[in-house]
From Swiss-Prot:
Gene name in the database record: pnp
Subcellular location, principal: cytoplasm
Originating organism: Polaromonas sp. (strain JS666 / ATCC BAA-500)
Lineage: Bacteria, Pseudomonadati, Pseudomonadota, Betaproteobacteria, Burkholderiales
Keyword Cytoplasm set for record: yes
Subcellular location: Cytoplasm
Main function: Involved in mRNA degradation. Catalyzes the phosphorolysis of single-stranded polyribonucleotides processively in the 3'- to 5'-direction.
Protein name per its UniProtKB record: Polyribonucleotide nucleotidyltransferase
Residue ranges of coiled coil: none
């Protein structure tokens, strides 16, 4: 009799077989599920505290996705030989799992919940994110914790005009899209994607296809819950204090209504703060017993009701716009004198200062990924300091949100970057958010595109991004173009679309409610396209095309090709030749296995000198050609003559002169410069030379020949 009560469910999902197990591993967690998807194995665990902390006013959910190097049969490369801080991929995957599960916890549930996912085994063809999403959903569903799931998730590719479910990494290379969709049986909750300028119809089709296929996983989770689910918690949302709600409404309603007639963000925020303080003071004066956190929640609900009802009634939005208008845009290029490229992009009260730096191949980021190491020649980093929203706060290493926003902006721009052959530079873009009132990641896309073009990067097209919002009450809904920060917090959807005039390059969607239909998404995509075209027009006015030349402060790259067999000659013994070349010419030289050499220098004369010397080193000795070189060594039977760097030939004693030569030193000395002709080379590469072939014969010899 086993001590384990193991339950297993398997299903075929596209080209993969998926197995879910519970009851054997991590039994002390509230819920634990192991998912095996064709050799990629993940363990998801969920633990929830039975009580919320007193005074808790938010839902403390943490999601940690952790990759173990043993999963790929590797030992960590760090000094300590153990896993360290999360990689960017781990952070992004943690966010990917958090986003669709967070809205499914009931309102008022403030107990701490921790979801931890370990990647235990990795098939390089099957990334860990989709199995991790499925395992997390299953672990939450069997745990008994209040959770309105399960959710399913799927990756969708677009290959040869067809949607492909959960493609392998190799297949993704041929795809024009990499899209992840997650949701319940009834509704899509999250979309994350990048694409190669695809139409709205193709993108929406992928979302619908992925959602349909995700239901296969949801059905399997339902079966697992039926056989292994724990009793559902007897949890009730805290009862609402209706008399206090009515009192707060009476005290604050008119004041907050007036505050939301103020168009300036800072003035409006200040008016709301005053209203909050007045309500607290009035409640104290009336002797009402209340919890400050609870009252703040009530005031937030009043704000949401005011804003949402105004929009659904067709009234102007918070800042006076209608639902389709983009805020005023100002663009300035080349704002920083000594950077390689820069742009200041301002849209309303959101502003991004974006700077591009060009580097050599050595500057590319080397990524030690679990599925294999690779180099990334395009980096985009997003920073949002607290002053951007007029606040004080911590300044330091990037938070999860900043990493996520940077990745979204990067996804948007990748599709239009030149290839390495077209533009061999490494590119780093940094977006400094200097003001924020909604959609700073999309401002980073616009500013990033302009900054790259300012740096002389030959982009295939301009890319613009726009953030859309949604307000929905029963059958009424309104899609909002270019949402403000407050509209993001108070709305039901955050929907970001980036692309060119030809199509979409990135799409991110986060939905807080059920009931978002395909038709609503269609309206949102069409409205987003209209806004994107408007912004692209402004960007094209400001900068029609990329600068023809890179900045004077950027390194110049010169590319040449050599025979791969000559690489060792350029490098030299122990790197002596390449080291001398770089030091003496003041250049950076990079050599690839196929014989491509990239020379980086700010001085074209130095680069030309490096090219000349490499050409000499790699040149082949030609039969019949005349060379001028120094004698490097005198031998009894001749002399060695240097023809090319690192290449000597033998001048035999019989080839020095027409007359008989008794002693080589009677004619030649070390260091002497002589002209020689190449007679032949043998199979070992040895070169035979002649001096006498270039000399006229003495007259008597000619007469004797005639006789």
């Amino acid at each position: 009799m086993s001590i384990f009560n193991k339950v297993t469910k398997s299903f075929q999902w596209g080209q993969h077989k998926v197995t879910m197990e519970t009851g054997e591993v991590a039994r002390q967690a509230s819920g634990a599920v192991v998912v095996d998807m064709d050799g990629t194995v993940v363990l998801a665990t969920v633990v929830a505290k039975t009580d919320a902390k007193p005074g808790q006013d938010f839902f403390p959910l943490t999601v940690d996705y952790l990759e173990k190097t043993y999963a790929a049969g590797r030992i960590p490369g760090s000094f300590f030989k153990r896993e360290g801080r999360p990689s960017e991929f781990e952070t992004l995957t943690s966010r990917l799992i958090d986003r669709p599960i967070r809205p499914l916890f009931p309102e008022g549930f403030f107990n701490e919940v921790q979801v931890v996912i370990h990647v235990l085994s990795l098939n390089p063809e099957v990334e860990g994110d989709i199995p991790a999403l499925i395992a997390s959903s299953a672990a939450l569903s069997i745990s008994g914790i209040p959770f309105n799931g399960p959710i399913g998730a799927a990756r969708v590719a677009y290959v040869d005009g067809q949607y492909v479910l959960n493609p392998g990494k190799t297949q993704l290379k041929d795809s024009k899209m990499d899209l992840v969709v997650a949701g319940t049986e009834a509704a899509v909750l999250m979309v994350e994607s990048e694409a190669q300028q695809l139409s709205e119809e193709i993108m929406l089709g992928a979302v619908v296809f992925g959602h349909e296929q995700a239901n296969i996983a949801i059905n399997a989770i339902h079966e697992l819950v039926r056989d292994a689910g724990k009793p559902v918690w007897d949890w009730q949302a805290p009862a609402k204090d209706e008399p206090l709600i009515a009192k707060v409404n009476e005290l604050a309603g008119a004041k907050l209504q007036a505050a939301y007639q103020i168009r300036s963000k800072q003035a409006r925020t200040q008016a709301c703060r005053v209203a909050y303080a007045d309500v607290m003071a009035a409640l104290k004066a009336d002797g009402v017993a209340f919890d400050g956190v609870t009252v703040e929640g009530m005031l937030f609900d009043i704000e949401a009701k005011i804003v949402r009802s105004q929009i659904l009634a067709g009234e102007p939005r918070i800042d006076g716009r209608d639902t389709r208008t983009v805020r005023a845009i100002e663009i300035r290029n080349s704002v920083l004198p000594r950077t390689h490229g820069s742009a200041l992009f301002t849209r309303g009260e959101t502003q991004a200062l974006v700077v591009t730096t060009l580097g050599t191949e050595r500057d590319a980021q080397r990524i030690d990924a679990l599925s294999g190491d690779y180099e990334d020649r395009f980096m985009l980093h997003y920073n949002m300091p607290p002053f951007a929203t007029g606040e004080t706060g911590r300044v330091g290493s990037p938070k999860r949100r900043e990493i996520g926003h940077g990745r979204l902006a990067k996804r948007a721009l990748i599709a239009v970057l030149p290839t390495k052959e077209e533009f061999p530079y490494t590119m780093r873009v940094v977006s400094e958010i200097t003001e924020s009132n909604g959609s700073s990641s999309m401002a980073s896309v616009c500013g990033g595109c302009l900054s790259l073009m300012d740096a002389g990067v030959p982009m295939k097209a301009h890319v613009a991004g726009i953030a859309m919002g949604l307000i929905k009450e029963e059958n009424r809904f309104a899609v909002l173009t270019d949402i403000l920060g407050d509209e993001d917090h108070l709305g039901d959807m955050d929907f970001k679309v980036a692309g060119t005039t030809f199509g979409i390059t990135a799409l991110q969607m986060d939905i807080k409610i059920q009931g978002i239909t395909k038709e609503i998404m269609q309206v949102a995509l069409a409205q987003a396209k209209e806004a994107r075209m408007h912004i692209l027009g402004k960007m094209q006015e400001a900068m029609g095309e990329a600068k023809a030349e890179v900045s004077d402060f950027a390194p110049r790259l010169y590319v040449m090709k050599i025979n791969p067999e000559k690489i060792r000659d350029v490098i030299g013994k122990g790197g002596a030749v390449i080291r001398a070349l770089t030091e003496e010419t003041g250049t950076q030289i990079n050599i690839e296995e196929d014989g491509t050499i990239t020379i980086a220098s700010n001085d074209s004369a130095k680069a030309d000198e490096a090219k000349r010397r490499i050409a000499e080193i790699t040149a082949e000795v030609e039969i019949g050609k005349v060379y001028e070189g120094a004698i490097t060594k005198i031998l009894d039977f001749g002399a060695l003559v240097n023809l090319l760097p690192g290449k000597d030939g033998l001048l035999h004693i019989s080839q020095i002169a027409h007359e008989r030569v008794e002693k080589v030193t009677d004619y030649l000395s070390e260091g002497q410069i002589v002209k020689v002709k190449v007679l032949e080379t043998d199979e070992k590469g040895r070169v035979k030379l002649s001096m006498k072939a270039l000399l006229d014969r003495p007259a008597q010899n000619q007469d004797q020949d005639r006789g």
